[in-house]
Amino acid sequence: MSNLTGTDKSVILLMTIGEDRAAEVFKHLSQREVQTLSAAMANVTQISNKQLTDVLAEFEQEAEQFAALNINANDYLRSVLVKALGEERAASLLEDILETRDTASGIETLNFMEPQSAADLIRDEHPQIIATILVHLKRAQAADILALFDERLRHDVMFVSHLWRRAASALAELTEVLNGLLDGQNLKRSKMGGVRTAAEIINLMKTQQEEAVITAVREFDGELAQKIIDEMFLFENLVDVD
């Protein structure tokens, strides 16, 4: 099995466990990892019985080792990387791996929750914290959650258009909030947000709610409201073209 890379082995394992389980695995991977595995999977033409048997045997052995030793995964990974790459390179790579693993995983939890449950979870937080969370969600999920807030809270979507500048000041509070709500997950600083994000989310709301939000934004900042409307119009045109 020496000719198989780690990616090859992962692809074989994913193709073995079935579509539903493979999809669940993908939910826990970064976009880059999903792209790498998907590209490799698309190039698979044939898997021999020996390759399949070897991969499953290796996976079983690794799984049993972790279960039997109750091993600390981070410590184990660090030891392996140090032996393979040396102390300095291992430390740098491990930092990147753990940062990628932890990035926005708490936010991903909200993406898969029922909108009502997610809305109930965050509705009592500061509007800026709620807005910061919403711009990291899938647009449809964010719109559904917004629709469940009262009118006054929905209007605070105007914060979204400035979040990329406010993210640093809100980050500490946001991390603390999510630590309590979602079992200690972390949020990596991001430049997500802006007029486009606001427009995409508002576009997915019901017409009456959409108009109310735009009206509230216009009262606060007419120029900003017009920018959002222009972006919404552009977004709708792109959808029509598709």
Curated annotation (Swiss-Prot):
Note the topology in the membrane. Answer: Peripheral membrane protein
Q: Which GO terms describe its molecular function?
A: cytoskeletal motor activity
GO BP annotations of the record are:
bacterial-type flagellum-dependent cell motility; chemotaxis
Q: Does the keyword Lyase apply?
A: no
Kindly list the places in or outside the cell where this protein is found, as annotated in its UniProt entry: Cell inner membrane; Bacterial flagellum basal body
Which top-level group of life is the source organism from? Answer: Bacteria
Annotated Gene Ontology cellular components are:
bacterial-type flagellum basal body; plasma membrane
Identify the Pfam families for this entry. FliG_M (PF14841), FliG_N (PF14842)
The keyword Amino-acid biosynthesis is assigned to this record: no
Q: Which keywords does this chain's UniProt record carry?
A: Bacterial flagellum, Cell inner membrane, Cell membrane, Chemotaxis, Flagellar rotation, Membrane
Q: Report the function annotation for this chain.
A: FliG is one of three proteins (FliG, FliN, FliM) that forms the rotor-mounted switch complex (C ring), located at the base of the basal body. This complex interacts with the CheY and CheZ chemotaxis proteins, in addition to contacting components of the motor that determine the direction of flagellar rotation.
Q: What family does the Swiss-Prot or TrEMBL record give for this protein?
A: Belongs to the FliG family.
Q: What is this protein called?
A: Flagellar motor switch protein FliG
Species, as recorded:
Shigella boydii
Q: What is the lineage of its organism?
A: Bacteria, Pseudomonadati, Pseudomonadota, Gammaproteobacteria, Enterobacterales
